[in-house]
Curated annotation (Swiss-Prot):
It catalyses: XMP + L-glutamine + ATP + H2O = GMP + L-glutamate + AMP + diphosphate + 2 H(+). Residues 9-207 form the Glutamine amidotransferase type-1 domain. It comes from Escherichia coli O139:H28 (strain E24377A / ETEC). One of its GO terms (cellular component) is cytosol. InterPro entries: Class_I_gatase-like, GATASE, GMP_synth_C, GMP_synth_GATase, GMP_synthase, GMPS_ATP_PPase_dom, NAD/GMP_synthase, Rossmann-like_a/b/a_fold. Homodimer. GO terms for molecular function: ATP binding; GMP synthase activity. SUPFAM superfamilies: Adenine nucleotide alpha hydrolases-like (SSF52402), Class I glutamine amidotransferase-like (SSF52317), GMP synthetase C-terminal dimerisation domain (SSF54810). This is GMP synthase [glutamine-hydrolyzing]. The gene is guaA.
Length: 525
C-alpha cells in the first residue's frame, strides 16, 4: 500500500496573475501537493477537494471595479487557513469588511517593508533591522490598488510609507494577506513565508517528493491498466521519456513505444533514443524510419503554420498505422503535464484568466477504442525532470534546451529539404558542442541554429563559393514569455562561426540574432 501523497493539499485560486503557476510550483517545492483552480469555484467543489489551506493569487484586475473577481464566500467559512497575495489580499480585505482604493502611487518593483506587529507568518524572518530593531523585509511589489482599511478583526503586520497595510493578519482565523509577491525570487524571504504558511500554519507534511510521486504513479498505472497492453509515442523529449520510464517500471513489457524518426531531429538523436531506451533501459521500441514520408509531404510548402500542420498530420498517420499493427492494445499513454491541463474551461463565468491549453491528444483511428493513461498530468515540468533523474535518466537529456515539436521543420525557414536539414543538423551540433565546452550551455535558456534559405558569396582558398547562411540564436529568459538575446563573448561567436564555415561544406556565412522577445519570438517560425 503506497502512502497517500495527496493527503495534505493546498488549493490555489487563480485571479489571473502571470505568477500564479509559480505559486503552485513553490508549494510543490515545499513537498506539498496543490492544485490551481479558477477563482469562481463552487462551495461544493472546495468541500470535495478538502484543502488544508487556501491561497488567493494575484491578478490584473481592480477590486474597486463592480464586476471584478471575488473569492467564493465559503473560502472564509471553511475553517482552514487562507493566504491572500496582492489581488488576493485586496479581495480578502474587501469581502471581510475592509476597504480598497486606487493608489496615487503605483508600486511596481523592489520595496522594503517594516514589520510592526508579531505574526506567525513572519516571526523570526527578516532581511535587515531598523535602527530601533524592527525587522525589514525585501519584497517585490506589483500593484496599483491598495488596502486603505483592514477588516476590524485584522491587525497590521507590516507597512511601507506608501502602503500602510503591506501585511495584514487575523491570527485566530489564520487569515493572512500580503501586498507583494512571495513566490518570486526578488522577495528574498518569500519561500520562508510560503513555507511558514503551508508547513506550519496549515500543518502540511512534506509528502510530495520525487520518490513518493514515482511510487504513487506506478501504483496508479497498475490499478488503471492491470495486465492490458499500452502504446506510447516516444519522441525522446522530456515528457514522453519520463512517461516511458514510469510505465516501464509499472508494466514492463506490456508497454510498446513507437519512435517515429521524421528526419527533422537533431544530429544523431534517433540513434541516441534507440540506444538509451532500447539497449540501455530495455524498453520495447518500434522504430519507424519515416524521413522520406515527412519530407515528401512538406515539399513545396513555405508557410510555417502549414508546415506544423503537415508534420502533425503525418505523425498521427504514421503512429496510427503502427498502432493498428499491434494486437490487443487497450491504452494510449501520453506525456500530458499539469500546465497542459490548466485551462479556462474551469471558469463558470468566463471571467477567469485564460491559460491556453494544448492537450497533445493525437487523433487515433475511430476503430481503436483506447483508454488514456497520463501519469504526468499532475506535474509541472520541473517536477517531471526531477522524477526523470530519480528514474535514472541522464541529466544532460532532462535539462536540454527546449526543442520544438515540429523539430527542424520550423528551424529551416521556408521549404524543408533533406539537404537543408543535414546542413542545419551539423551546424547546430557545432554550436551546442562549443557552448558546452565554454561552460555557457547552462547559462543560456535556449540556443539553436536556424537555416536561412538565402545564398551568400564566400571565399575559400583562391576560389569564391556561393553557399547558404545560418543564424545562431541564444536567449536568456525566466518564463519564455519574454526573453533577452544572450550576450555571448565575441571570441566565442567567432570560434563557432569559423568551425561551421570550415567544417560544414555548403554554409558560407554565419550571423547572430540579437532580437529580444518582444518584438521577435524566440523561434523564427
Amino acid at each position: 500500500m503506497t502512502e497517500n501523497i495527496h493527503k495534505h493539499r493546498i488549493l490555489i485560486l487563480d485571479f489571473g496573475s502571470q505568477y500564479t503557476q509559480l505559486v503552485a510550483r513553490r508549494v510543490r517545492e515545499l513537498g506539498v501537493y496543490c492544485e490551481l483552480w479558477a477563482w469562481d469555484v463552487t462551495e461544493a467543489q472546495i468541500r470535495d477537494f478538502n484543502p488544508s489551506g487556501i491561497i488567493l493569487s494575484g491578478g490584473p484586475e481592480s477590486t474597486t471595479e463592480e464586476n471584478s473577481p471575488r473569492a467564493p464566500q465559503y473560502v472564509f467559512e471553511a475553517g482552514v487557513p487562507v493566504f491572500g497575495v496582492c489581488y488576493g489580499m485586496q479581495t480578502m480585505a474587501m469581502q471581510l469588511g475592509g476597504h480598497v482604493e486606487a493608489s496615487n502611487e503605483r508600486e511596481f518593483g523592489y520595496a522594503q517593508v517594516e514589520v510592526v506587529n508579531d505574526s506567525a507568518l513572519v516571526r523570526g524572518i527578516e532581511d535587515a533591522l531598523t535602527a530601533d530593531g524592527k525587522p525589514l523585509l525585501d519584497v517585490w511589489m506589483s500593484h496599483g490598488d491598495k488596502v486603505t482599511a483592514i477588516p476590524s478583526d485584522f491587525v497590521t503586520v507590516a507597512s511601507t510609507e506608501s502602503c500602510p497595510f503591506a501585511i495584514m493578519a487575523n491570527e485566530e482565523k489564520r487569515f493572512y494577506g500580503v501586498q507583494f509577491h512571495p513566490e518570486v525570487t526578488h522577495t528574498r524571504q518569500g519561500m520562508r513565508m510560503l513555507e511558514r504558511f503551508v508547513r506550519d500554519i496549515c500543518q502540511c507534511e512534506a509528502l510530495w517528493t520525487p520518490a513518493k510521486i514515482i511510487d504513487d504513479a506506478v501504483a496508479r498505472i497498475r490499478e488503471q491498466v492491470g495486465d492490458d497492453k499500452v502504446i506510447l509515442g516516444l519522441s525522446g523529449g522530456v515528457d514522453s521519456s519520463v512517461t516511458a520510464m514510469l510505465l516501464h517500471r509499472a508494466i514492463g513489457k506490456n508497454l510498446t513505444c513507437v519512435f517515429v524518426d521524421n528526419g527533422l531531429l537533431r544530429l544523431s538523436e534517433a540513434e541516441q533514443v534507440l540506444d538509451m531506451f532500447g539497449d540501455h533501459f530495455g524498453l520495447n521500441i518500434v522504430h519507424v524510419p519515416a524521413e522520406d514520408r515527412f519530407l515528401s509531404a512538406l515539399a513545396g510548402e513555405n508557410d510555417p503554420e502549414a508546415k506544423r500542420k503537415i508534420i502533425g498530420r503525418v505523425f498521427v498517420e504514421v503512429f496510427d498505422e503502427e498502432a493498428l499493427k499491434l494486437e490487443d492494445v487497450k491504452w494510449l499513454a501520453q506525456g500530458t503535464i499539469y500546465p497542459d491541463v490548466i485551462e479556462s474551461a474551469a471558469s463558470a463565468t468566463g471571467k477567469a484568466h485564460v491559460i491556453k491549453s494544448h492537450h497533445n491528444v493525437g487523433g487515433l483511428p475511430k476503430e481503436m477504442k483506447m483508454g488514456l493513461v497520463e501519469p504526468l498530468k499532475e506535474l509541472f515540468k520541473d517536477e517531471v525532470r526531477k522524477i526523470g533523474l530519480e528514474l535514472g535518466l541522464p541529466y544532460d537529456m532532462l535539462y536540454r534546451h527546449p526543442f520544438p515539436g515540429p523539430g527542424l521543420g520550423v528551424r529551416v525557414l521556408g521549404e524543408v529539404k533533406k539537404e537543408y536539414c543535414d546542413l542545419l543538423r551539423r551546424a547546430d551540433a557545432i554550436f551546442i558542442e562549443e557552448l558546452r565546452k565554454a561552460d555557457l550551455y547552462d547559462k543560456v535558456s535556449q540556443a539553436f541554429t536556424v537555416f536561412l534559405p538565402v545564398r551568400s558569396v564566400g571565399v575559400m582558398g583562391d576560389g569564391r563559393k556561393y553557399d547558404w547562411v545560418v543564424s545562431l540564436r541564444a536567449v536568456e529568459t525566466i518564463d519564455f514569455m519574454t526573453a533577452h538575446w544572450a550576450h555571448l563573448p565575441y571570441d566565442f561567436l567567432g570560434r563557432v562561426s569559423n568551425r561551421i564555415i570550415n567544417e560544414v561544406n555548403g554554409i558560407s556565412r554565419v550571423v547572430y540574432d540579437i532580437s529580444g522577445k518582444p518584438p521577435a519570438t524566440i523561434e523564427w517560425e
